[in-house]
Amino acid sequence: MSYKELSTILKILSDSSRLEILDLLSCGELCACDLLEHFQFSQPTLSHHMKSLVDNELVTTRKDGNKHWYQLNHAILDDIIQNLNIINTSNQRCVCKNVKSGDC
């Protein structure tokens, strides 16, 4: 995952409603109507948040009749965590390896 991709995803996650949606989905697959019951916003607002989460692959979706079902994409969440851990530690991939300390 590139810095640009990680930055985009972190911007998506900076919205408290989206974080709460992900937390609700951590319990398992839910339909839009179940998610909507938890929030005090309209269906179009939920659709806006879900589109952002789905477009950025944080959530997967399937349609069953007239219902939309949503599920966490655990693989991408694991990838995000792994990339943040890389930033948090010195390792072979770290860009700091290309910077010479004190050679200003």
Swiss-Prot record:
Function, as annotated: Transcriptional repressor for the ars operon. ArsR is a trans-acting regulatory protein which controls its own expression. The repressive effect of ArsR is alleviated by oxyions of +III oxidation state of arsenic, antimony, and bismuth, as well as arsenate (As(V)).
Molecular function per GO: DNA binding; DNA-binding transcription factor activity
The entry's DNA-binding region: 32-51
Taxonomic lineage of the native organism: Bacteria, Bacillati, Bacillota, Bacilli, Bacillales
Keyword Repressor: yes
Domain HTH arsR-type residues, every copy: 1-92
Coiled coil: none
Originating species: Staphylococcus aureus
GO biological process, one term: response to arsenic-containing substance
Alphabetically ordered keywords of this record: Arsenical resistance, DNA-binding, Plasmid, Repressor, Transcription, Transcription regulation
SMART domains documented for this protein: HTH_ARSR (SM00418)
Descriptive protein name: Arsenical resistance operon repressor
